[in-house]
Amino acid sequence: MCHQKLTISWFAMVLLVSPLMAIWELEKDVYVVEVDWSPGAPGERVVLTCDTSEEDDIIWTSDQSSEVVGSGKTLIVQVKEFSDAGQYTCHKGGETLSHSRLLLHKKEDGIWSTDILKDQKDPKNKTFLKCEAANYSGRFTCWWLTAVSTDLKFSLKSSSSSSDSRSVTCGAASLSTEKVTVDQRDYNKYSVACQEDITCPTAEETLPIELVMEAQHKYKYENYSTGFFIRDIIKPDPPKNLQLKPLKSSQVEVSWEYPDSWSTPHSYFSLKFFVQVYRKKEKKGESLLVDKPSAKIRCSKGGEVRVRAQDHYYNSSWSEWASVSCN
């Protein structure tokens, strides 16, 4: 988690009272309050200061209350529940002076909450973020699932700013138009494209890319971390331009090309290919594993030839299938 120091100025601010850094600034005028969710925990004491040189006739309101919640230049809020979070605004004479938004990051039994995102159930450990790269250019896409539909905000970025870390720039998250169904429940899918700032595709990776995704839902804050080498998230795009050339009997020669997105030169960034004859009524057809972009195989009417690709030298994920009919 990136904790940012609070700067004392005439701007609206939160005064850090907890020695455990339980309150920190997420962005301008937005603060995360880390709250112990166990029964009997006292919550966190937050002091808000109005951005004004005036001292008198100041009142405070909250977007969670229809009544005035305090008066004076400072306001003390004991934050324990989500009803204590929200946007606090100071006013004088009908004029808005400044505001601060408080978000809760809850911790229960020593574990930070992970309520916003769906666990995608990696066999070894919890997986909330999944990432894939179509080549070694340093560009990749990450995605996640959530059952939440409204009042969401996501930000994906490098989790470390040290000079020896791999810096990454990510775009804005976008919502897929299609739902993803898991265990008979529909989820929204968000994705974001990222690019490593400095990359050398032919160099061996010695440090992983480390990312943190910050999620906000209404007044709730959570973060999710992931780390990987580009080589471990490679999934080539499918081969393109599949063509069949009839030979004698039912034998055909199938040829294809490398996907446009794959790294070049192909003599260095080689792919291997899995070729399969597929028929709906047959569980398993003839198949071949080849290094070059062509193969001879038997395929009769009603079947199709399918081809998928994998990094030749590293056990990457296989691409999706590309196919051509044998008719």
UniProtKB/Swiss-Prot annotation:
Q: Which family does it belong to?
A: Belongs to the IL-12B family.
Which species is this record about?
A: Sigmodon hispidus (Hispid cotton rat)
Positions bearing carbohydrate? 125, 135, 223, 315
List the SMART domains hit by this protein, alphabetically.
Answer: IGc2 (SM00408)
Subcellular localization(s) per the UniProt record: Secreted
Q: Can you provide one Gene Ontology molecular function annotated for this UniProt record? A: cytokine activity
Q: Chief location of this protein?
A: secreted
* Residues of the Ig-like C2-type domain: 23-106
Q: Name one Pfam family in it.
A: IL12p40_C
**One GO cellular component term:** membrane
- CDD domains xrefs: FN3 (cd00063)
Domain (Fibronectin type-III): residue spans on this chain:
238-327
- Show which residues constitute the signal peptide: 1-22
**What is the protein name given in its UniProt record?**
Interleukin-12 subunit beta
The organism's superkingdom is given as Eukaryota
Function noted in UniProt: Cytokine that can act as a growth factor for activated T and NK cells, enhance the lytic activity of NK/lymphokine-activated killer cells, and stimulate the production of IFN-gamma by resting PBMC. Associates with IL23A to form the IL-23 interleukin, a heterodimeric cytokine which functions in innate and adaptive immunity. IL-23 may constitute with IL-17 an acute response to infection in peripheral tissues. IL-23 binds to a heterodimeric receptor complex composed of IL12RB1 and IL23R, activates the Jak-Stat signaling cascade, stimulates memory rather than naive T-cells and promotes production of pro-inflammatory cytokines. IL-23 induces autoimmune inflammation and thus may be responsible for autoimmune inflammatory diseases and may be important for tumorigenesis.
Quaternary structure note: Heterodimer with IL12A; disulfide-linked. The heterodimer is known as interleukin IL-12. Heterodimer with IL23A; disulfide-linked. The heterodimer is known as interleukin IL-23. Also secreted as a monomer. Interacts with NBR1; this interaction promotes IL-12 secretion.
Q: Which Gene3D superfamilies match?
A: Immunoglobulins
Task: Alphabetically list the UniProt keywords.
Answer: Cytokine, Disulfide bond, Glycoprotein, Immunoglobulin domain, Secreted, Signal
